[in-house]
């Protein structure tokens, strides 16, 4: 396997890792992103975790195949559990998990706040839950990028704890800084968000006879983003 062949999603996540000394890849799956980060010079060392034994072993085998096992530590654990004493982590990367799960992993790891760890997050779904958690718990979103892969669209989020909470609405939770993104992937992402909200609005109209202004405003703003792309 060529380490470069990791797909557009993981490449986008990797692009947000800057100056990584020790990068923790949570839910590392088969270790492809971890390997790429080391091989490309984006990480000096990797801590790879997974809750399942088989994918973690695949990651171990992949690093051995490339003769860089000395560049990584592997942990069979849930999220970041057991890593609180590892105070040299500079980045935590979480890709491919649901938004609620990502939020819970961050919540359960206070060292992220204490040590100024950079977060790189790419939820498989429910990105709104990730943004909401970050807004309400003092994390500042520093960058977001949209990315498409296999006809699905995602957002990659870079964030760091500052202690500053952010007032937010439906639009902020579902769009965030992606409103600054342009191109085909951005348009695909915005269209996905619009479809979901129009469906939600229709359901609310049927069930309650009305739709909250917050949602209708979000729909109109997203339509404008699509038109500009």
Residue ranges of model-derived segments:
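Class I S-adenosyl-L-methionine
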Residues: 2-6, 91, 100-229
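Conserved alpha-helix/loop element of class I SAM-dependent methyltransferases that forms part
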Residues: 4-20
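Conserved class I S-adenosyl-L-methionine
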Residues: 20-29
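Glycine-rich SAM-binding Motif I of class I
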Residues: 31, 35
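Conserved SAM-binding motif I beta-strand of class I
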Residues: 45-50
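Conserved SAM/SAH-binding beta-strand->alpha-helix loop
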Residues: 52-54
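S-adenosyl-L-methionine
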Residues: 60-86
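Short SAM/SAH-binding signature in class I
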Residues: 88-96
């Amino acid at each position: 396997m060529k380490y470069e062949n990791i797909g557009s999603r993981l490449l986008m996540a990797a692009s947000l890792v800057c100056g990584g000394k020790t990068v923790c890849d949570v839910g590392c799956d088969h270790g492809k992103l971890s390997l790429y980060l080391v091989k490309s010079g984006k990480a000096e060392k990797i801590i790879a975790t997974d809750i399942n034994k088989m994918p973690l072993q695949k990651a171990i085998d992949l690093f051995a195949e490339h003769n860089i096992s000395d560049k990584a530590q592997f942990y069979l654990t849930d999220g970041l559990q057991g890593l609180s004493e590892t105070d040299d982590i500079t980045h935590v990367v979480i890709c491919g998990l649901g938004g609620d799960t990502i939020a819970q992993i961050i919540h359960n790891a206070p060292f992220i706040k204490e040590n100024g760890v950079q977060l790189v997050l790419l939820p498989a779904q429910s990105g709104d839950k990730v943004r909401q958690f970050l807004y309400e718990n003092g994390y500042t979103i520093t960058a977001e990028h949209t990315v498409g892969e296999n006809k699905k669209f995602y957002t990659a989020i870079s964030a760091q704890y500052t202690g500053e909470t952010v007032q937010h609405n439906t639009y902020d939770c579902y769009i965030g800084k992606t409103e600054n993104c342009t191109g085909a992937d951005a348009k695909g992402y915005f269209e996905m968000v619009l479809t979901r909200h129009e469906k939600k609005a229709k359901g609310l109209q049927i069930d309650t006879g009305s739709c909250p202004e917050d949602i209708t405003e979000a729909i109109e703003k997203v339509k404008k983003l699509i038109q500009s792309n």
